[in-house]
Amino acid sequence: MTIKASGGSSLARPQLYQTVPLSNISQAEQQDRYLESGELTALKTFYDSGLKRLAIAQAIKLSSQLIVSRAANRIFAGGSPLAYLDQPETDTDDSDLGVSMAVGDASGATGIFGGVKNLFLGSGGGKIPAGFRPISVSRYGPRNMTKSLRDMAWFLRYTTYAIVAGDPSILVVNTRGLKEVIENACSIPATIVAIQEMKAASLDLFRGDREAQETVVQYFDVLITEMQTQVPNDKLRQRPSIDAQGLQLPQSYFNAAEKRQKFVMKPGLSALEKNSVVKAAYRQIFERDITRAYSQSISYLESQVKSGDISMKEFVRRLAKSPLYRKQFFEPFINSRALELAFRHILGRGPSSREEVQEYFAIVSSGGLAALVDALVDSQEYADYFGEETVPYLRGLGQEAQECRNWGMQQDLFKYSAPFRKVPQFITTFASYNQPLPDQHVYGSGNDALEIQFGAIFPKATRSPSASPAPFNKDTRRILIHRGPGINNQLGNPRARATQPGSLGAKVFRLNNELPSGKTTNVSFSESATQKVIEAAYRQVFGRMVYAGQRQKVAEIKLENGEITLREFIRALAKSDVFRNTYWSSLYVTKAVEYIHRRLLGRPTYGRQEINSYFDTCAKKGFYALVDAIIDSKEYEEAFGEDTVPYERYLTPGGYSLRQTRPGALREDVGVKVKVEKTARFIELGTSSTKNLPVTDVDARLKQGVNIQRQQTKAFKLTDTFNKVELKTAIAAAYRQIFERDIEPYIVDAQFTALESKLGNREINMKEFIEGLGCSELYQKEFYTPYPNTKVIEMGTKHFLGRAPLDQQEIRKYNQILASQGLKAFIGAMVNSMEYLDNFGEDTVPFRRFPTLPAANFPNTERLYNQLTKQNRDLVVPSFEPAVKR
């Protein structure tokens, strides 16, 4: 087993401290029950006193400098401790909290100066511990003075945190064990005196408010007690195994973690308490309370364990051997997965090593479920942790130290969804430790974005989850493919880092405003070249062109004027709010570092050593320092210099394969070269073909060259006006034919209600309805007034005859009518023509007829119908050829 193994990158959020709501609700959740009256009362008291506790914390916060100063004056001598106190950051208006600050009104002080006077002239906070002596400021040193005052401010701030949380857990976790640390740097008696003085100063703020003073005393006393407590011993993991990792958990982590109740079966327990212990055993073995959820139980075993005939250890053994357990957790799984679930149920953990899996796999393979259960229950580990009376429990994060080699799988095993995963996780992960390193990010495959141009797209861990380990050590370097000649790889040939990739790599943009001759400068050439470089910079940094409002106009102007270099322009883009919000604020730090590194430096990160340095920069200095570290690096200077837009220099093997056609992943009938079978010429000549025969059918001649739209054309014919659905359909078709769009109801109500009523009452037919639409004000406004007569004639024949004008003779005919008699006479001439009656009759809505004779009219009709309404004013059938401009 390698010592560099890592069991995946499963995310864990350890609990940092306890609160009243969390403590009460977690106990009820562990026992799968509703909150009891005592827990509800505790929650009610917590929320009722919430405003009071917030007011206390706010009052202490406002006077924190005075309180710390008073404590410092008490333990330091020979100087001014206030000079070493860091000024707190100015907060926004405190009234935003909505907390009334009416505290300390009953004191004898008047105004703020009275409060300051009470703070500095108040009495001590308690009995002075033995060994206390004031500390000389000059001998203590400025550095130690600053640290001591900072620590006192921390103690005061953590006290306010505990007051707001309603639980002293945060004080216990953060101060227990500090005694030895403080003794090495300062003095425990002096620290106790300082805390007592801060306690007394805080009490002076609440004179006359007994409840507030009791709250302050409670939490300061806890702080003083914990400061005097010896450093607790770490919790060691108990396992007499030669292949297990030696692990220990700091006591502070255990104190901060969720409290997991231990259920112990004692002979003197009441019947109700024994029932709760039995239910806890059901929840551990079957992962649910089977008596409550499914009305199932093993009654004879329950009676035996309650009466003391068998111990809890035997009860667990028989539950795990029961037919119910076999049916749910053994038969549906293969042996390796059943072994993992049995470890969770009986020992409260997952398998620890490959050797352990092999040992118990041999047992379950030879003896079945019964032998596996006996081996686990009779093990020394079970006896050390649970003994004869304790119900097994999950030994997860916070209960004891966790191993790194099975970290991800164990976190998944503790989830409620574990029985739904059929594939074994532990044995496959342990086996992968001896395999070559995978082609993935060193901190998990989910941190590698898809290597595409647009955006940062990362694979989701919730879809096809994989906790496969990636045991990369700090010296491991990822395999990267150079986009360019292989001889210019920067690892094998560092001097070729500045060499451009040529045709084998990405296109390179350089900012150079001078012409190759170097004698003259073309202004327009310079401006266009600069704009191209700016666009390339946006595409490289953001992966796309940003919106006009997101462009960095000031930086662009400076670059065009030569005030900044292209390198500084790239820095300005990377530090913009748009880039920060898109690729920093919305991503986890590791993902953000990886993506920003690819955008600014043109390659993925190499390994843990490089990422850790960037991570340290982000943690200590923030986002802008990360951008500066990348752009100011020697690699950036050598690869791009001051005048080159960063480009993609390296790819991962996964990204390279993503951009390639992968024939191996395609079906046999896809991606295969098509072989054309050639037919012998004498066979072609001897085969009869209809294409060589003369076409004598007139209908076939008429239909040649006409697309499928002719068969798909639907003619709307109004035959029954009493059918309201048919009437509305025909009217809507008429609107679309004449106006080339649907007409809004308010326009219909204003202009066409009378026409529709007459059509519905059979006072007019469809032909007269069409003529009325053409003579309306709306048609005149849209198709007559804005256009010349020739264009009006084209649109009129399209709307009322379903074709383009036949020839110039027809255009002259309608032009005379239109010029002498107006629009209504023009429309009447078309609607009352014999052509209209032959094609549409009295009751059919006009439609496109696809006329093929004369031959010149068919392409004109195609152009007229394929041209959108009001798209342009060009004539489809011009009266003369346009003159060519010279």
Swiss-Prot record:
Top-level taxonomy: Bacteria, Bacillati, Cyanobacteriota, Cyanophyceae, Oscillatoriophycideae
Compartments where found: Cellular thylakoid membrane
Annotated function: This protein is postulated to act both as terminal energy acceptor (by its phycobilin-like domains) and as a linker polypeptide (by its repeats and arms) that stabilizes the phycobilisome core architecture. Has intrinsic bilin lyase activity.
MF (Gene Ontology): lyase activity
Keywords attached to this entry: Antenna complex, Bile pigment, Chromophore, Electron transport, Lyase, Membrane, Photosynthesis, Phycobilisome, Repeat, Thylakoid, Transport
Subunit structure: Heterodimer with ApcF (a variant beta-allophycocyanin). Phycobilisomes of this organism are composed of a two cylinder core, from which six rods radiate. The core is mainly composed of allophycocyanin alpha and beta chains and of minor components.
Source organism: Picosynechococcus sp. (strain ATCC 27264 / PCC 7002 / PR-6) (Agmenellum quadruplicatum)
EC class of the enzyme, as a word: lyase
Name of a matching Pfam family: Phycobilisome
Protein name as catalogued: Phycobiliprotein ApcE
Modifications made to the protein after synthesis: Contains one covalently linked bilin chromophore. This protein autochromophorylates.
Enzyme Commission number(s) of this protein: 4.-.-.-
Primary residence: membrane
